[in-house]
């Protein structure tokens, strides 16, 4: 069953370039594991209708053919070599896993 991963990503101010370096490596790897990046959004004040939390720097919506594909993506050796960039640049993130209804 397909699984959808939504992430709300909060980047440390001033570390946007480091975050972009990590994304340039991680995003292409998604397709190796039957995944597709459906959306990568940087919301602005003008696009937010209502919120009770701090707006994230980016929102990602990714589809994988199965939960196992997502787990294998997280274990990818190339991606793991660059996790230090993620740790250096991300203040916090929310990961929401779901299915299509």
PLM feature spans:
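Short S/T/G/P-rich N-terminal loop/turn motif that feeds into the first structured element of a domain
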Residues: 1-75, 96-101
């Amino acid at each position: 069953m397909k699984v959808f991963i939504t992430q709300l990503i909060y980047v440390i101010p001033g570390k946007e370039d480091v975050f972009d370096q990590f994304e340039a490596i991680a995003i292409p790897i998604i397709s190796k594991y039957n995944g597709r990046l459906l959306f990568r959004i940087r919301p602005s004040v003008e696009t937010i209708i209502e919120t009770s939390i701090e707006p994230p720097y980016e929102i990602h919506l990714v589809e994988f053919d199965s939960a196992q594909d997502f787990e294998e993506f997280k274990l990818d050796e190339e991606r793991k070599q660059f996790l230090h960039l993620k740790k250096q640049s991300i203040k916090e993130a929310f990961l929401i896993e779901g299915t299509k209804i």
